Amino acid sequence: MTVILRPGSVPLSDLETIYWTGAPARLDAAFDAGIAKAAARIAEIVAGNAPVYGINTGFGKLASIKIDSSDVATLQRNLILSHCCGVGQPLTEDIVRLIMALKLISLGRGASGVRLELVRLIEAMLDKGVIPLIPEKGSVGASGDLAPLAHMAAVMMGHGEAFFAGERMKGDAALKAAGLSPVTLAAKEGLALINGTQVSTALALAGLFRAHRAGQAALITGALSTDAAMGSSAPFHPDIHTLRGHKGQIDTAAALRQLLTGSPIRQSHIEGDERVQDPYCIRCQPQVDGACLDLLRSVAATLTIEANAVTDNPLVLSDNSVVSGGNFHAEPVAFAADQIALAVCEIGAISQRRIALLVDPALSYGLPAFLAKKPGLNSGLMIAEVTSAALMSENKQLSHPASVDSTPTSANQEDHVSMACHGARRLLQMTENLFSIIGIEALAAVQGIEFRAPLTTSPELQKAAAAVRGVSSSIEEDRYMADDLKAAGDLVASGRLAAAVSAGILPKLEN
């Protein structure tokens, strides 16, 4: 199903659909007239003699050099090819598709001055599955994501490399195989394609979507751990959280209550339990995971604005003037990425502490050491917990802010930059680590629940436990564990663990 984009009002849900499903996207036809009007204005400037940055001048520090009208097409070609300086591994197809959709949205606002031909080619590439090879490194997040977006633009011109039908090939070959033709860029079109924050924004959105999916799964594993440790649900009482007032905390507590409702394990110790309070990793889940949820929701609002923004330069304004500005500076995206990193780090940190609690007989209220059937002969989940600690610590290091690390570039013309691109890209590794941490907690918590037999957990959590056991059987004795950890992490990453419980329980990303 094709996602129809209405630039300026594209909802987060449409972007998430493109990311998770690979759905093609195209602009609503109602925006064609605005695009064509701006393109006509650029053509007028080319026909005249007045120098206008990015149209008939050089770029960056070379902006004072006037370009003859006969060289305008060559200028655009040279711009793209000279800026194809990315290094590192190719970005994955889901990221590149999102980048292309975001570029459509920006161009569709009618302020970039590109021809409809250019827009139609991007739409066709998405529809046919021509995915430009974009190296992951090379952007400092201002003046836009120049190098990575140049690799996208190069394929549109028949240069560079692309993936098509599962094969890596030259850009012109990929277009030909898909029945498409390369475009010759007109005035300003090269700059419009590469001068934007779409790579940083796509990476940040991917980090956001993955972090939220992990956060939803963490509520399930947190509830399972609460029951496995025979923890109290009293700290999730709604009045406690209403008195504080944070929406994420209130929603998180409500989800935990619903997940634990009807648990025979909980009912068995609701009276006469000599423990007065649980450790913070059980008791303070609403406060910690709720704060993370609030942070992700705030970031979601920022990135929705950025996804709908025009981040090109110069811009064709509503009065038909062409004005240079700085919308290419990705500082909002850099801040958003740093905030997502904090949330990812903390969701994993409190999950890891619950894993540590479950494997420690001094804390787990009757569970065997390391959740092993015969501790000593078997090591159980001893080293799985160590792995979770390693991943947690790695995420702590990766969570350090990228946005504060500016450096001047381009002969000091671009003297302050955002570092949004790598700040957002590290979220992919951080969320991959988080999926594994939560997967390990799922294994530990379900194993702990089984040790409480004949008592069982709640109906909702039984469904989640069944999903875990669908990919990893009960650990009766020590075995090769890497496959179990991968399967559990994949269960979280795919969204299948979150989908195992009834719809409407887990908090949504948008308020």
From Swiss-Prot:
Enzyme class at the top of the EC tree: lyase
Modified residues annotated as 2,3-didehydroalanine (Ser) in this record: S143
Annotated Pfam families: Lyase_aromatic (PF00221)
One MF term in the entry's GO annotations: histidine ammonia-lyase activity
Post-translational modification: Contains an active site 4-methylidene-imidazol-5-one (MIO), which is formed autocatalytically by cyclization and dehydration of residues Ala-Ser-Gly.
CC per GO annotation: cytoplasm
Pathway noted in the entry: Amino-acid degradation; L-histidine degradation into L-glutamate; N-formimidoyl-L-glutamate from L-histidine: step 1/3
Primary location class: cytoplasm
Family: Belongs to the PAL/histidase family.
Name of the protein: Histidine ammonia-lyase
Taxonomic lineage: Bacteria, Pseudomonadati, Pseudomonadota, Alphaproteobacteria, Hyphomicrobiales
